[in-house]
Amino acid sequence: MAHVRGLQLPGCLALAALCTLVHSQHVFLAPQQALSLLQRVRRANSVFLEEVRKGNLERECVEETCSYEEAFEALESSTATDVFWAKYTACETARTPRDKLAACLEGNCAEGLGTNYRGHLNITQSGIQCQLWRSRYPHKPEINSTTHPGADLQENFCRNPDSSTTGPWCYTTDPTVRRQECSIPVCGQDQVTVAMTPRSEGSGVNLSPPSEQCVPDRGQQYQGRLAVTTHGLPCLAWASAQAKALSKHQDFNSAVQLVENFCRNPDGDEEGVWCYVAGKPGDFGYCDLNYCEEAMEEETGGGLDEDPDRAIEGRTATSEYQTFFDPRTFGSGEADCGLRPLFEKKSLEDKTERELLESYIDGRIVEGSDAEIGMSPWQVMLFRKSPQELLCGATLISDRWVLTAAHCLLYPPWDKNFTENDLLVRIGKHSRTRYERNIEKISMLEKIYIHPRYNWRENLDRDIALMKLKKPVAFSDYIHPVCLPDRETAASLLQAGYKGRVTGWGNLKETWTANVGKVQPSVLQVVNLPIVERPVCKDSTRIRITDNMFCAGYKPDEGKRGDACEGDSGGPFVMKSPFNNCWYQMGIVSWGEGCDRDGKYGFYTHVFRLKKWIQKVIDQFGE
């Protein structure tokens, strides 16, 4: 009896529900809703059934015109039916003849607007490689797999998710060309959606280094007759009164012959040959030569004979920091840079710095943790005045100067071209949003200096900028500058497997949604990341990597995770020297493809490589 009663009650409820439906205004459900509520009894012999379903689908929908319900009957899955139905409706005009419909459903040709296309072409009509649909670089896409889940936005394949009248397209890897159509075969016809129109040689993005003979050793032995800068300015003669006055206190190599007004590299600038130009006193410019690329280990090796691990194991923290900049132009702070008031100056360690030292001996922040207060006193927040928002991270290198990434200030594909009046910097902060009274300092900017050879068009090469503060900032327990590395420090620490530290207020994970509140941290985040071998960095991306960059992060098989993410850009990648206990800024958070993805790494501007440029700008404009 109990069993019978148990069956009767649901029956009564069902009858009551049916009566309610009959008397309601909306009686019928949409086909997709109705079919999703129907429970079907599973049948045996799945292999046989697959053949039957395929035959049913072909009979119902290829040989004849079918409905959504008939397709569902054949596929027995709402998800599979939705995928099929999207292609089927896209092939509406191709239903006769049969072979044309079959080709359309296969997806290797375009029918109508080409929304059916599911092929693997990833080159545009002019020959530009497509940007990954999941990537934000070089373009921020408004269309992605979240906004258009049924559009099959895989990898960087051409698609038509917005039913463009010109057919399948993609975002491009050229920052100057946001999106472009692809040349797709038209179903059943001997033609394509748009004709191929290859760009003229020399236009667009360089996907590989120039093939011409390269200049070794950063042009220090260069004896050519080039006498014009990359910006087309003529060089001043080295014997001119202006050039002589500027050269008087410079540490020039006497072996480099300064002939006429030819570009030379007398100070061993890692950026290569340069010359003085007319204009403001101290104006200079770099000259355009194709330099031989050197691996990071070779370029920073500086002729050291020691094995890096042995060098670190065998030395103690007694080496004093040697000042590099002129305090008249640089300002104060270099003499005790990298020594944090709440840690090194009190002989205390923070919670995770031991991990860095152990990595030396043993050989955007995602998966990071909250930083301790005073842990990164050189951290700067680059803040937009209107609308008020966090733009990027940055680093305090003296009481007058701040270092950041150039793309935080200038990146036309994202409509970025900020001036000093658009921005301010907040120094000494821990909280992301709260104003920290008596702790943080807010400073206005006097001038922004972007590297003259910053390459936003191709690969963010030389992604570096200096910002001069209107007034010197006072140091405190929470505000203190970081050191910039010399050659020996770079040689010792920039080794694959050695860990550095990234800090920032960027997103905690990658997101496409407008509601980013849940992925933004409340306080400064910190993560320790290992430097990655240069060949692995190069193999992880299609973007051309230069020796002004290095990459860091965990490999898929290492069992750990971590990365910088959106909002961390411009912030520091620092390492602590076991020789003198000072913290050095080795890199600037530059770019990455997504956040914390397997097989992808964060790329950082190589600060040591660009230190001579930093010095030249500060010497010229510091007083």
Curated annotation (Swiss-Prot):
<feature type="disulfide bond">
    <location>
        <begin position="392"/>
        <end position="408"/>
    </location>
</feature>
<comment type="function">
    <text>Thrombin, which cleaves bonds after Arg and Lys, converts fibrinogen to fibrin and activates factors V, VII, VIII, XIII, and, in complex with thrombomodulin, protein C. Functions in blood homeostasis, inflammation and wound healing. Activates coagulation factor XI (F11); activation is promoted by the contact with negatively charged surfaces. Triggers the production of pro-inflammatory cytokines, such as MCP-1/CCL2 and IL8/CXCL8, in endothelial cells.</text>
</comment>
<feature type="modified residue" description="4-carboxyglutamate">
    <location>
        <position position="60"/>
    </location>
</feature>
<feature type="modified residue" description="4-carboxyglutamate">
    <location>
        <position position="63"/>
    </location>
</feature>
<dbReference type="InterPro" id="IPR051659">
    <property type="entry name" value="Serine_Protease_S1-Domain"/>
</dbReference>
<dbReference type="GO" id="GO:0005615">
    <property type="term" value="C:extracellular space"/>
</dbReference>
<keyword id="KW-0645">Protease</keyword>
<dbReference type="Pfam" id="PF00594">
    <property type="entry name" value="Gla"/>
</dbReference>
<feature type="disulfide bond">
    <location>
        <begin position="214"/>
        <end position="292"/>
    </location>
</feature>
<dbReference type="GO" id="GO:0030194">
    <property type="term" value="P:positive regulation of blood coagulation"/>
</dbReference>
<dbReference type="GO" id="GO:0006953">
    <property type="term" value="P:acute-phase response"/>
</dbReference>
<feature type="disulfide bond">
    <location>
        <begin position="158"/>
        <end position="182"/>
    </location>
</feature>
<dbReference type="InterPro" id="IPR003966">
    <property type="entry name" value="Prothrombin/thrombin"/>
</dbReference>
<keyword id="KW-0011">Acute phase</keyword>
<dbReference type="InterPro" id="IPR001254">
    <property type="entry name" value="Trypsin_dom"/>
</dbReference>
<keyword id="KW-1015">Disulfide bond</keyword>
<feature type="modified residue" description="4-carboxyglutamate">
    <location>
        <position position="69"/>
    </location>
</feature>
<feature type="disulfide bond">
    <location>
        <begin position="565"/>
        <end position="595"/>
    </location>
</feature>
<feature type="disulfide bond" description="Interchain (between light and heavy chains)">
    <location>
        <begin position="337"/>
        <end position="483"/>
    </location>
</feature>
<feature type="domain" description="Kringle 2">
    <location>
        <begin position="213"/>
        <end position="292"/>
    </location>
</feature>
<dbReference type="GO" id="GO:0005509">
    <property type="term" value="F:calcium ion binding"/>
</dbReference>
<dbReference type="GO" id="GO:0004252">
    <property type="term" value="F:serine-type endopeptidase activity"/>
</dbReference>
<feature type="modified residue" description="4-carboxyglutamate">
    <location>
        <position position="73"/>
    </location>
</feature>
<feature type="modified residue" description="4-carboxyglutamate">
    <location>
        <position position="58"/>
    </location>
</feature>
<feature type="disulfide bond">
    <location>
        <begin position="263"/>
        <end position="287"/>
    </location>
</feature>
<feature type="modified residue" description="4-carboxyglutamate">
    <location>
        <position position="76"/>
    </location>
</feature>
<feature type="modified residue" description="4-carboxyglutamate">
    <location>
        <position position="64"/>
    </location>
</feature>
<dbReference type="InterPro" id="IPR033116">
    <property type="entry name" value="TRYPSIN_SER"/>
</dbReference>
<keyword id="KW-0165">Cleavage on pair of basic residues</keyword>
<protein>
    <recommendedName>
        <fullName>Prothrombin</fullName>
        <ecNumber>3.4.21.5</ecNumber>
    </recommendedName>
</protein>
<keyword id="KW-0094">Blood coagulation</keyword>
<feature type="disulfide bond">
    <location>
        <begin position="537"/>
        <end position="551"/>
    </location>
</feature>
<dbReference type="Pfam" id="PF00089">
    <property type="entry name" value="Trypsin"/>
</dbReference>
<feature type="modified residue" description="4-carboxyglutamate">
    <location>
        <position position="70"/>
    </location>
</feature>
<feature type="signal peptide">
    <location>
        <begin position="1"/>
        <end position="24"/>
    </location>
</feature>
<keyword id="KW-0356">Hemostasis</keyword>
<keyword id="KW-0325">Glycoprotein</keyword>
<feature type="site" description="Cleavage; by factor Xa">
    <location>
        <begin position="364"/>
        <end position="365"/>
    </location>
</feature>
<feature type="site" description="Cleavage; by thrombin">
    <location>
        <begin position="199"/>
        <end position="200"/>
    </location>
</feature>
<feature type="modified residue" description="4-carboxyglutamate">
    <location>
        <position position="51"/>
    </location>
</feature>
<dbReference type="InterPro" id="IPR043504">
    <property type="entry name" value="Peptidase_S1_PA_chymotrypsin"/>
</dbReference>
<dbReference type="GO" id="GO:0030168">
    <property type="term" value="P:platelet activation"/>
</dbReference>
